[in-house]
């Protein structure tokens, strides 16, 4: 029986890590953490006005007091971070030595 190297599980680990990252992203982006306003029969989670006999509820939405929306910036943040890391790696490593065959100068004989 010949000796065989153990199986390489790097692709399985990468797929599992990617799945966990996507799951965490979806969980955190779809979670509603706004405070509960109103009673069980009259809930106003996104703001509004309700009047019923002696009960009056007027609640402004959390976003109405702060109209700034940072969603477009959050979409481009990962790309910006990747580009920043790449630029810092290129600028900080001035003594870059490439040992691959296509980077080495060909000797002309």
Swiss-Prot record:
Question: Which species does this protein come from?
Answer: Indian citrus ringspot virus (isolate Kinnow mandarin/India/K1/1996)
**Compartment annotation:** Host endoplasmic reticulum membrane
Name the predominant localization: host cell
Name-wise, this protein is Movement protein TGB2
Q: Which residues lie on this side of the membrane: Cytoplasmic?
A: 1-9, 93-109
Q: Describe the function of this protein.
A: Plays a role in viral cell-to-cell propagation, by facilitating genome transport to neighboring plant cells through plasmosdesmata,.
Q: What else is known?
A: TGBp1, TGBp2 and TGBp3 seem to act together for cell-to-cell propagation. TGBp1 is the main movement protein that physically cross the plasmodesma with the viral genome. TGBp2 and TGBp3 would facilitate TGBp1 function.
Q: Where are the transmembrane segments?
A: 10-30, 72-92
The UniProt entry's GO CC annotations, sorted and at most eight, read:
host cell endoplasmic reticulum membrane; membrane
Q: Name one Pfam family in it.
A: Plant_vir_prot
Which family does the record assign?
Belongs to the Tymovirales TGBp2 protein family.
- Residue numbers on the Lumenal membrane side: 31-71
Which UniProt key words apply to this protein? Host endoplasmic reticulum, Host membrane, Membrane, Transmembrane, Transmembrane helix
Alphabetical list of InterPro entries matching this protein: Plant_vir_prot
């Amino acid at each position: 029986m010949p000796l065989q190297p153990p199986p390489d599980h790097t692709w399985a680990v990468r797929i599992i890590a990617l799945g966990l990252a996507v799951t965490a992203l979806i969980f955190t982006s779809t979670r509603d953490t706004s405070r509960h306003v109103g009673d069980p029969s009259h809930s106003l989670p996104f703001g509004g006005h309700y009047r019923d006999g002696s009960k009056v509820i007027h609640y402004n939405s959390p976003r109405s007091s702060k109209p700034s929306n940072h969603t477009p910036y959050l979409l481009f943040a990962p790309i910006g971070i990747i580009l920043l890391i790449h630029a810092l790696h290129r600028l900080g490593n001035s003594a870059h030595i490439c040992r691959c065959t296509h980077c080495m100068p060909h000797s002309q004989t």
